[in-house]
Amino acid sequence: MGTVAFDAIETPFGKTDKIVGGAGTFAALSASFLYDQVKLVGVIGEDFGDDNLNIITSKGVDVEGIQIIEGGKSFFWAGKYHNDMNSRDTITTELNVLENFDPIIPESYQDCEFLLLGNATPQVQMTTLNRLKNKPKLVVLDTMNFWMDIAMDDLKAVLKHVDVLTINDGEARQLSGEYSLVKAAAVILEMGPKYLIIKKGEHGALLFGEGQIFSAPALPLAEVFDPTGAGDAFAGGFIGYLAKVKTINFTNMKNAVVYGSALASFCVEKFGTERLQTLTQEEIEARLKAFVSLAKFDI
């Protein structure tokens, strides 16, 4: 479940008009490289159009769960990235059809075993989970500082029902009240999740769970064109790998973090979904080998 939207992005490398974006879009496209039964729940306006929807369906993603609101306008976000590509200014946010989004879970989705609750209001995330007749084998939740600012109690209520939380380092500190990420993880894991992933952008990601810690590197990239969908592509790759292997343990979680990191590293190479549209399995395999060699050493 996640947003399917239009973005307009400006970075030091260029700018775009309205292009396809949204957390649900990036996550679904990313997951589709690892798992062949990706199903997407979201909402779009009539303005989205078949050509844009085809970007998603061309990768085999099931869009029965996407509501198309007649006469409605799709969610739109415009932002400008600073030179460091880590900080950005939001220029425009138009919720449009997202404002009254009430997720519908089609009958064909009811056997879902692996659920990603993409970045959305905690109420929508909880509603999505409640509308599945059986609790999935694994529930992954992505959120952001905005919801911590305005809906912390609702967010904490959802956290009691999820298995994996994925947030960035600033959000981990805000949610826990601890500066040390190790201490922050201990506090957050008491809130409900069995595993926690803390994304650190160009510095990789940390995985906490089962009393263990894993640090995944980030691949140093010569050029980063657009980091907008990176976190969502990471989440999609992460859950896509776990859906493929089906067994949940710390070893598979570690591999899933690396797969997620690999997919995210492709996503940032072009604007929007452009790179994920042309990506091949051979490129993914080569990138995974690069990740392994990056952190492999003998003592």
Model-derived regions, located:
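Short, conserved phosphate/pyrophosphate- and ester-handling motifs at nucleotide-, phospho-/glycolipid
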Residues: A31, N168, G231
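Conserved phosphate/ATP/ADP-binding segment of small-molecule kinases
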Residues: K133-L138, W147-S215
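Histidine-anchored nucleotide/phosphate-binding helix
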Residues: A23-S32, L129
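Conserved N-terminal subdomain of the carbohydrate kinase-like
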Residues: F6-K18, F33-L116, N130-K135, E285-I299
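Conserved phosphate-binding/catalytic region of the ribokinase-like
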Residues: L181-I299
